[in-house]
Structures are given as structure tokens and as C-alpha cells.
Amino acid sequence: MIMTNEATTPSGQPLGISHKPSKSGAMFTKFKAENKPAFIGYLPYGFPNPDVSLDAFKTMVEHGVDAVEIGLPYSDPVMDGPVIQAAASIALNNGETIKRVFEAVETVANAGGVPLIMSYWNLVYHYGVERFARDFENAGGAGLITPDLIPDEAGEWIEASDRHGLDRIFLVSPDSSTERLETVARNARGFVYAAARMGVTGERATIDASPELLVERTRQAGAENVCVGIGVSTAEQGAKVGSYADGVIVGSALVHTLLADDNKTARDPKEGLKLLAAKSEELAEGIHNAR
């Protein structure tokens, strides 16, 4: 069983069909032909301020990031670690709202990257699901990562994303049952996000074998593309994960470059962008040469 553009209810009944191509799916098709994984990088929009965040997204793409996961800052980020929470807090203090994030989507698309948004579902729901899908598509968006939305409760989003040709990226974890993996694979579009462990995000000193097993189980459940988010912070770690995953997702290590040494305030923008470019290149080298 493979992932198609056909959405279903959690029980497997067809819900709708999108005839628009998957932008992230096209990226994976290209990279599989080249036998290399994709590099997906995360930064919250509005951090350290709106203008610099746009420069940061462009810098990432120019220095090796293939798809940019644009985070929507949220006041209660239960799954984010201290580094991302600090960045999101700065962005929220800048008054960032969901309306303005589409400017970041356009920036990534114009730079040649694949624009993704990561958002807690409450933000999308209150903005309006259909309105969000329409505005996201019009800005050139590819797909939405929803860490707290499961397929069983995603009927409205599945229908809206089909109408607008947007990818649905659901999460799985090592604790996910086979039934849950199958439900996610059946309803996902673009790729499945394999969270290496449940709990908050953050950089890891070492990486064990559990993510590789999760990728294998998720593929067996029917997912065509599986990307891993595990706290990768070095080129060596990126290469290790990239040897078996279709994509490597990096967040905290990139956010860290724009934070000051106290991990609470923003670094000087010029210095931060320079560090971000260097870190992006370092990770891209490891990830893209993993095989």
C-alpha cells in the first residue's frame, strides 16, 4: 500500500481526491532518483523579528535547506523544547499573527524552497480551515504539519487540503500502534513525520536505533515518504538519519544560531544570519551525502 492523493476517513472510506500535484511529493521523487534524503529546516516566523525572519528563511534555502518548516508561534507550545519556546516567545512579543505568516511562505517559494507550515491546530481552526487552506495555497504553500491533530479528527482539514492541493503531514511516534500507523499513512499526503520520541523537541547528544525502526514500521503501514525529527544537531547525526529516512528535520540546532548565549534573547541579526548560513551548509553536507 502506498500513499496517494486520495484522502479517506480514518476507517478507509474515500473522502475526496486532490488532482493537484504534491509539492513535497515532487521533491521526494526528485531526491529518490538522486538517492539522497531531503533536508527540512524549521524556524518560527517572526523570530527574532519579522524582517530578519524572512531573511533567515531565504538564507536557509540559499545554503542547502530543501524545505522550510515555518513555525506559527503559539502561547502554549506543549511539544516544543526550551530553545524553540524561547524563540516563539520572542516572536509572540513582536505581535506576530497567522495572517502574516503567508509572507514567509511566499519568501520561501520565491527562493526555490518547499514551504511548509507547522502549527498547533487551534490556530488554524480559529483562523478558519477553508480560509487558511485558500490563503496558504495562494501564497505558494506546500503542506501543513499538525503535531496535535490526528486523522480521526481531521475531516474538515482533509477536505480543505484536497480542494487546495495541500499536503497533510501527521505525526507518528515509537509508541504508535500498527493501526495508528496505518491510519496516518492512509490519510497523509506528501510525507509522514516520524517523531523519534514523544515529548518536547530539542537537540540530542546521541541518536539510537529507535527512529530507524519507526521509519520501517511506518513504511510497512503504507507511507511512501517518511521524514524523521529527532534533535539532529551535527552533520554526522544528519548523515546517520539520512541513511534510512526520506528526509531529515532539523529545528533547535538552526533556531540556536539566532539566539544569544543566554538562550533567552535574540543574537545580533547580522551575526545570527551568518551562523545560520554556516549551520545550514554543515547539515546539508551531511544529510545530502548520507548514502
Swiss-Prot record:
The keyword Lyase applies. The active site is at E69 (proton acceptor), D80 (proton acceptor). PROSITE patterns: TRP_SYNTHASE_ALPHA. Its EC number is 4.2.1.20. Pathway: Amino-acid biosynthesis; L-tryptophan biosynthesis; L-tryptophan from chorismate: step 5/5. Gene3D superfamilies: Aldolase class I (3.20.20.70). The keyword Amino-acid biosynthesis applies. It comes from the Bacteria. GO terms for cellular component: cytosol. It catalyses: (1S,2R)-1-C-(indol-3-yl)glycerol 3-phosphate + L-serine = D-glyceraldehyde 3-phosphate + L-tryptophan + H2O. Keywords: Amino-acid biosynthesis, Aromatic amino acid biosynthesis, Lyase, Tryptophan biosynthesis. Tetramer of two alpha and two beta chains. Belongs to the TrpA family. The alpha subunit is responsible for the aldol cleavage of indoleglycerol phosphate to indole and glyceraldehyde 3-phosphate. This is Tryptophan synthase alpha chain. The gene is trpA.
